[in-house]
Amino acid sequence: MDAQLEWASSLVPKRQLQQQQQQQEQQQQQQQDFHKDQLMTVGMRIRQRVDQGYASRTPSTSDASLQPGVIRDYSSVIVPQFTRSPLPTANSLPPMLINQRTMSTEASSLEKWDVAEPAAEHEAMVNGSKRRL
């Protein structure tokens, strides 16, 4: 009987050890599953944070900048000396189209845009080479 008691008493610590190992494995598996879930949803969480950031109001934003459909002009922030050149008015005639190897003698519409000299010289060179053909 003493041998059976010793054998039974030796099983208890082994069972406890096995239970502890199983609990540790379960905890590790739960941590791994948690980390996998976190990694699988990272893209969605980033998109959500960015969306919330755009929707949040900061002190520098105005009501007009938060309204959808309002076009914001950031050109002066990106390039400080940049100013937009105005579009030509709708009252002017459109440039003539090339038809049967003839060209309009009217000046190009680029002159209306105040194009820099090198571009105008390039345009004259291109127009001259077309006339020779």
Curated annotation (Swiss-Prot):
Keyword terms of this UniProt record: Cytoplasm, Nucleus, Phosphoprotein
Quaternary structure and interacting proteins, as annotated: Interacts with RNR2 and RNR4.
Stretch forming the signal peptide: none
Descriptive protein name: Damage-regulated import facilitator 1
GO biological process: protein localization
Subcellular compartments: Cytoplasm; Nucleus
Posttranslational mods: Phosphorylated by DUN1 in response to DNA damage which leads to its degradation.
Stated family: Belongs to the DIF1/spd1 family.
Purpose of the protein: Mediates the nuclear localization of RNR2 and RNR4, 2 subunits of the ribonucleotide reductase.
One cellular component term from this protein's GO annotations in UniProt: cytoplasm
Low complexity bias: start-end ranges: 16-32
Source taxon at top rank: Eukaryota
GO molecular function terms listed in the Swiss-Prot or TrEMBL record: ribonucleoside-diphosphate reductase inhibitor activity
Chain segments carrying region Disordered: 1-40
Main location: cytoplasm
